[in-house]
Amino acid sequence: MTNPANKITDDLDDLLNVLPGSITSALRGVGRFDELIEIVMDLGRTPESRYASFADPSQAELILRREEVSLDDLAFVVGRIGDFDTDNRAGITRTLHRISGIKNRRGAVVGLTCRVGRAVYGTIGIIEDFIASGKSILLLGRPGIGKTTMLREAARVLADGKRVVIVDTSNEIGGDGDIPHPAVGRARRMQVSKPSMQHEVMIEAVENHNPQVIVIDEIGRALEAEAARTIAERGVQLIGTAHGQTLENLMSNPTLSDLIGGIESVTLSDEEARRRGTQKTVLERRAPPTFDVLIEIHARNRLIVHPSVADAVDAILRGRVPVTELRYVDAAGAVQVERT
């Protein structure tokens, strides 16, 4: 299995155009645009740029100028991006960039995080067999590791042959504005007026638009986990992300553990406890998992795959090591799979 060379679209000039000139000039002087993750501007502090610097962590954050960020600097950016949503996020029309605001208690913007959004074509080559399988897939990983990028590419690829609907709560998958970014291909996109309504839009997507696949970013609330289960029970393939980095994280999260079947305490009979060699009170999986497959993104092009969430959860609860696959792209661009 080979991983084709990735084509990247970042619309970076659109982001640079909303930044103060001195910051834009500093960024151009540094270069390293392929590694740029975000620009941070906090009132009274020097502006910084952050990079995905894997080889040298000391180069992951750079000060862009000695002059501290002023209210005029912040106003310059805010004036070019428009109003923030209720989650203090804004975007740039027809791009994947995200600008998040920090406000004081009076509602004035005192800080900005300008996140670079990229469409990276070819990122799902490493898991294309699972994506095409029709199984529901949950992606986990730390912020900035590439979950949303992979989600976006999955939507684009699947939309070539299936009815795909994206529930885009923060417009991070399909970009800002009413016309979705070309990176999602033929997938349809439903926007969400405020984050607390995400679960309702998930159900609306199923009831009104007859999708075969629903793509959802950042499942983080109990109502969203419940909506995901309802969708899966209707036979719709789900591809989503959730807060957490590993399967064990999710199992210990009372809000989201329902995604992997839920965990409950049960009392065994004396005979069953002897047969298992355990105490009478044990933890067990409560129900079938909402997601069939769970993928932990540990680094770009390096993943841990749990091919069967049900089997993995049961194994962990009984003190066994679950069956997993380590997948990575080697120096020659080939996808390697190591089963444990």
Q: Which stretches of residues belong to each language-model region?
A:
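P-loop NTP-binding catalytic core
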Residues: 65, 77-137, 177
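P-loop NTPase nucleotide-binding module
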Residues: 116, 127-172
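N-terminal accessory targeting/assembly segments
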Residues: 1-95
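Conserved P-loop NTPase nucleotide-binding/switch module
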Residues: 210-211, 215-271
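Short hydrophobic alpha-helical runs that function as membrane-insertion/retention elements
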Residues: 138, 163-167, 191, 213-217, ...
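Conserved P-loop NTPase
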Residues: 265-340
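Conserved nucleotide-binding/hydrolysis micro-motifs of P-loop NTPases
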Residues: 46, 95-98, 104-106, 120, ...
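P-loop NTPase switch/communication element
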Residues: 158-205, 251-261
